[in-house]
């Protein structure tokens, strides 16, 4: 795909951000060599200092963007405290970026249970064994915990840990960016005051 292939009419005239995101993600799934659903997640601590890390988007619809994590981790604690977060997708193969930010809610137990059951058995054991974001004396301590939980759940199903679930970001803004020559990029932002509100679309200077 050439850098001039996408014209302004290809996406800047779209009025439904979730449909536009779905289309862009589908294209990324066909062109990105690794994890097209990888996204930078930004949170802030109690002092207002930001933290950012990569996570995997595990679902989205008109209600928001979903990912899963250990709620006792740094990001889990910061989100539970602040109830706000931001994301940034960057698809180098497509020369595109999507930024969003908004309010965060916890997914239902049913939704978390259903996703948890789809994870590899080793990943489900890891959710029990890892005290995410806390000091680790050495690799052996982690491997020992994995062995202990593997033995504990050798027979039958592995339940979802009470500290492991999902968050849904209900976006208040979503910005779509596409690279153009000479830094004259296309940028369109969708904004709303509340998660249930109507979108306002604004074209932005690059």
Curated annotation (Swiss-Prot):
**A GO term, aspect molecular function:** pyridoxamine phosphate oxidase activity
Name the positions where substrate binds.
Answer: 58, 115, 119, 123, 183-185
Q: Organism source for this protein?
A: Rhizobium rhizogenes (strain K84 / ATCC BAA-868)
What EC class is this?
Answer: oxidoreductase
Complex formation: Homodimer.
| Family stated for the protein in its record | Belongs to the pyridoxamine 5'-phosphate oxidase family.
Annotated binding of FMN, by residue:
53-58, 68-69, 75, 97, 132-133, 177, 187
Q: What gene codes for this chain? A: pdxH
- Sorted UniProt keywords: Flavoprotein, FMN, Oxidoreductase, Pyridoxine biosynthesis
Pathway stated in the Swiss-Prot or TrEMBL entry: Cofactor metabolism; pyridoxal 5'-phosphate salvage; pyridoxal 5'-phosphate from pyridoxamine 5'-phosphate: step 1/1; Cofactor metabolism; pyridoxal 5'-phosphate salvage; pyridoxal 5'-phosphate from pyridoxine 5'-phosphate: step 1/1
Name of the protein described by the UniProt record: Pyridoxine/pyridoxamine 5'-phosphate oxidase
Gene3D superfamilies assigned to the protein according to its UniProt record, in alphabetical order? Electron Transport, Fmn-binding Protein, Chain A
Catalytic function, reaction form: pyridoxamine 5'-phosphate + O2 + H2O = pyridoxal 5'-phosphate + H2O2 + NH4(+); pyridoxine 5'-phosphate + O2 = pyridoxal 5'-phosphate + H2O2
């Amino acid at each position: 795909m050439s850098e001039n292939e996408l014209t302004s009419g290809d996406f800047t005239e779209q009025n439904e951000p979730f449909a536009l995101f779905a289309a862009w993600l589908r294209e990324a799934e066909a062109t990105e060599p690794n994890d097209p659903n990888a996204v930078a997640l930004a949170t802030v601590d109690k002092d207002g200092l930001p933290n950012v890390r990569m996570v995997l988007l595990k679902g989205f619809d008109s209600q928001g963007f979903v990912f899963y994590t250990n709620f006792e981790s740094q990001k889990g604690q910061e989100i539970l405290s602040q109830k706000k977060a931001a994301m940034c997708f960057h698809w180098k193969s497509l020369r595109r970026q999507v930024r969003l930010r908004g309010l965060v809610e916890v997914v239902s137990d049913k939704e978390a249970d259903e996703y948890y059951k789809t994870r590899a058995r080793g990943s489900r054991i890891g959710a029990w064994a890892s005290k995410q974001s806390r000091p680790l004396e050495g690799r052996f301590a982690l491997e020992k915990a994995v062995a202990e939980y593997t033995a504990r759940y050798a027979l039958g199903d592995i339940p979802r840990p009470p500290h492991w679930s999902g968050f849904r970001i209900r976006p208040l803004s979503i910005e779509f960016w596409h690279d153009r020559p000479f830094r004259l990029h296309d940028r369109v932002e969708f904004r709303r005051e509340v998660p249930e509100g109507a979108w306002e679309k604004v074209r932005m200077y690059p």
